[in-house]
Amino acid sequence: MKINPVKWLQTLAVFAFLTCLTGGILEAKIKIHSIKSPDGKLELQAVTQANISFCLLRGDQVLVSSAPLSLTLEDGTILGPNARISKARTTNVREVIPSPLYRKSEITAVYNQLDISFREGFGIRFRLYDQGAAYQFYTTGRDSLHIVNESAGFLFEKDYTCYVPYSRGEANPFHNSFENVYTVTPVSGFELGRLAFLPLLVCLDDGIKMVLTESDLESYPGMFLKGEKTSRGYEYRGVFAPIPSTTRTEPVRGQVIPTGYSQVIARTTGTRSFPWRIMAVSEKDTELPVNDLVYALGAPNRTGSTDWIKPGKVAWDWWNNWGITGVDFPVGINTETYKYYIDFAAANGIEYVVLDEGWSPPAGQDIMQVIPQIDLQELVTYAGKKNVSLILWCVAYVLDEKLEEACSFYSQMGFRGFKVDFMDRDDQPVVEMLYRLAETAARHRLLIDFHGMYKPTGFNRTYPNVVNFEGIFGLEQSKWSQEDMVPYDVIFPYIRMLAGPVDYTQGGMRNATRQDFHPVYNNPMAAGTRARQVATYVVFDNPLVMLCDNPTTYMKEQETTSFITRIPVAWDETRILQGELGK
């Protein structure tokens, strides 16, 4: 889109806010502040008049502009409209960020920042990197805030093609596992009544791509998007899960499910910063999987030393349904079976074994209970002698019930972490719970793998012991879904992986063409070639990565197994030599 000053002045008169400006005579009340990216290619113009808005440009092309920015409080106060500027200042920053267990050992973040504070007790920070832009609200001078809405809208003049991950929670889109393939659709084709979770990709003109996502999500709900054509253009509007007013506890796993919602999206301290809204920009598709804005905008490390946090591969039980063969003991969730997994891990240099769902009786919903078929202390001792570490699966809400007790007990026993599952929400109470889990686990030197989880939001910078995240349509789907995962697997690295690592759970050894593939729960197969499964260990970011198939199968294919186990899981640097979205 080329900028026409007259057109934009007319837009200003009609909508009482300026989306973008390159020239013309304006009223004195309109204030325009601009910053450029360090390489000079991007420019962000922030406009304050009756409302606060911004636009992001690349040369004379408007990439995106905003709807009016505001926070609406429960008492009716709206922070944004008619705000009076107290101070506006720009800074140039270069910082080196250690990034353990990430796709590179450190990040050099270079950006220009515009910080506008207002007399009404709030402000907005805008940051512009070579790789994109971000903004966040902050508030001051209040004891507490009850927020009922945040106005966050991303406006495009054209009906661009987008890669949309719809929430699959059709009855309640706020309750979902953040797993879906991408629907390729123009903004105007967004399905009515649905919401999309982040990240979401927009294909702009001239091969430019933009990924919308967020970072530093703490004590606040995650953002969903709703696409529609409005009088302002083609818009993705932010939607936020309210705080649940009523819940029910699912009887089998103890998962807490909302049954009603309040009008408030966040009850929080009055002096704080809010999540960064990110617009990551690429000229080449290969720039997207190594865009570091989400990590760089996360809150700094709160764990101190990270030397004790070890990445590695995992021999996993659940996907293959404990399906080992040729043994002289009953196969199942028992001590003998897990010793077999430990022996396999030790023989192949695999660092971890996960004890997935079933080691603790589900009916009790008590993480301190263990089924009689398993002796945990015996397994920890056995694994330790073979230089293998053990990780326990659990439901997040069940762990939270006895968090301090469980972390202390299992850490002292010798376990190295938890695979935490079935959150399936990103409202404020769940986000706060996950920070609580991560902090407590870190104090007891336990790593965390968040399954059933929303996308990474810089969490792994703040708590590096959180080493992996699901929020991905991973290989477990092949147990029950007919979806074609082969195209998906060459799309999501450019979108979801921009946000951070993926607990994809790869390594299926029974491989089938699309024609022959069909879901099998107990003895699943993987669509595509064996080489494709091996390649995922290089292409996908997985500091804690599963070998999902059973040890018996891997031992029959030792050449493939040995190749997989030699591939590193943490890197000093990541470079993408060639690639294209969807290919």
Predicted regions and their residues:
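Bacterial N-terminal signal peptides that target proteins for export
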Residues: 2-13
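Bacterial N-terminal signal peptides
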Residues: 11-23
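Sec/Tat signal peptide C-region and signal peptidase I cleavage site
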Residues: 24-28
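N-terminal accessory beta-strand-rich subdomains and adjacent acidic, glycine-rich linkers
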Residues: 30-296, 301
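Conserved, mostly hydrophobic/aromatic
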Residues: 137, 345, 421, 448, ...
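An acidic-aromatic substrate-binding cleft motif
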Residues: 265-344, 348
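Aromatic- and carboxylate-enriched substrate-binding clefts and catalytic-loop regions
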Residues: 356-525, 529
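Glycan-recognition and catalytic regions of carbohydrate-active enzymes
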Residues: 549-583
